[in-house]
């Protein structure tokens, strides 16, 4: 369950589920309701918990800042989360799309954006918005600051390879291949112009993802939201990302979250469990009751398939201060009424959505 508003978005203990939830065996570590009631902390749980043992919870920048989040804004939310929400299970901050675009703006994407890339075409943070990334440091310093607070850092990524890398025919790290060798110019995102697809029948395509994930893992990344994966369903790209994450050798597990969802068929559940920790089951959800209402049917379909380590995701929680520089709408407090917000939280908890 991901908050998407600014630091004013506060909800304590929304992860507590009822006795039936625990009786179903998720999670398999006893009654956390009683644990929470007695201990009022999440810090003493067993150290051997499996990856994504409960639905991941945290904050995502999209609904408030769109493509334009800054380092200072991320750290302000991180400090607030550490002080007020961490002990209730909220522990991950996710930098959403276009952190590598120095011309990023509210309300849309830029054609032919001058993306910041390394010599192998891998994305690097805009050092103006993220000053600690200057000098090729990437998100390493920011991840260290977030980890120091006892939290995790995640980020968004589009599937495929940057068009700029293909136009310049940059080399694929560790191989004799180039970006033009591995690009798939026919399978591109319909709504974001940054990337081409990857030709997964070419061995250099896996090498591209391996090199990209090796870089991201070296920064200390904990969570990766990969977009344009499920509508249509790109099984070869999903599997390639999963393999790349498994190969990254920096001692940290990385949760893979797939987005967006559309109307994902439950027949994909075994494949999704094999390759990801989370997968969206809808398109973007905003602060409109009609968006929330549609999630009842989606979560009803997916609830029987929820299991430790692998979660169907009903999308972020659009509460609090949103729209500051977002894709949709203007600066506002969530338009959902208090009753609608309570209903959303109840539905997400019953459906065990991240």
Outline where the language-model segments fall:
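Aromatic-lined carbohydrate-binding/catalytic grooves of carbohydrate-active enzymes
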Residues: 73, 77, 81-223, 228, ...
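Carbohydrate-recognition beta-sandwich/jelly-roll modules
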Residues: 1-84
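Glycan-recognition surfaces
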Residues: 177-188, 199-201, 207, 211, ...
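Solvent-exposed loop/turn segments at secondary-structure junctions
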Residues: 62-67, 98-102, 159-163, 228-232, ...
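Structural recognition of the beta-strand scaffold that forms the well-ordered cores
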Residues: 51, 55-61, 89-96, 101, ...
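Glycine- and acidic
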Residues: 57-65, 194-198, 222-224, 331-332
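Alpha-helical scaffolding within the catalytic cores
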Residues: 36-47, 139, 203-213, 240, ...
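Extracytoplasmic, non-cytosolic globular domains
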Residues: 212-262
């Amino acid at each position: 369950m991901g908050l998407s508003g600014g630091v004013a978005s506060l909800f304590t203990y929304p992860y507590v589920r009822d006795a039936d939830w625990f009786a179903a065996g998720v999670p398999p570590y006893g009654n956390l309701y009683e644990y929470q009631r007695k201990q009022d902390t999440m810090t003493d749980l067993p150290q051997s918990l499996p990856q994504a043992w409960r639905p991941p919870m945290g904050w995502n920048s999209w609904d408030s800042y769109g493509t334009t989040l800054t380092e200072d804004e991320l750290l302000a939310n991180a400090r607030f989360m550490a002080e007020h929400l961490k002990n209730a299970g909220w522990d991950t901050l996710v930098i959403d799309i276009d952190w590598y675009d120095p011309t990023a703006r509210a309300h849309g994407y830029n054609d032919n954006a001058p993306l910041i890339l390394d010599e192998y075409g891998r994305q690097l943070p805009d050092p103006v918005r993220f000053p600690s990334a200057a000098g090729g440091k990437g998100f390493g310093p920011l991840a260290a600051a977030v980890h120091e607070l006892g939290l995790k850092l995640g980020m968004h990524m589009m599937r495929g390879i940057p068009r700029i890398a293909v136009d310049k025919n940059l080399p694929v790290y560790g191989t004799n291949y180039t970006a033009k060798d591995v690009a798939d110019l026919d399978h591109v995102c319909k709504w974001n112009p940054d990337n081409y697809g990857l030709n997964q029948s070419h061995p250099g395509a896996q090498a591209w993802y391996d090199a990209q994930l090796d870089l991201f893992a070296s920064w200390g990344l904990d969570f990766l939201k990969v977009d344009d994966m499920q509508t249509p369903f790109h099984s070869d790209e999903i599997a390639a990302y999963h393999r790349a994450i498994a190969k990254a050798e920096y001692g940290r597990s990385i949760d893979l979250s797939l987005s967006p969802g559309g109307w994902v068929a439950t027949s994909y559940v075994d494949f999704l469990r094999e390759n990801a920790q989370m997968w969206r089951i809808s398109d973007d959800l905003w602060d409109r009751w009609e968006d929330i209402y549609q999630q009842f049917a989606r979560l009803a379909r997916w609830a029987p398939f929820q299991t430790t380590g692998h979660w169907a995701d009903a999308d972020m929680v659009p509460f609090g201060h949103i729209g500051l520089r977002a894709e949709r709408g203007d600066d506002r407090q969530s338009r959902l009424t208090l009753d609608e917000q309570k209903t959303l939280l109840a539905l997400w908890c019953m459906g065990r959505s991240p």
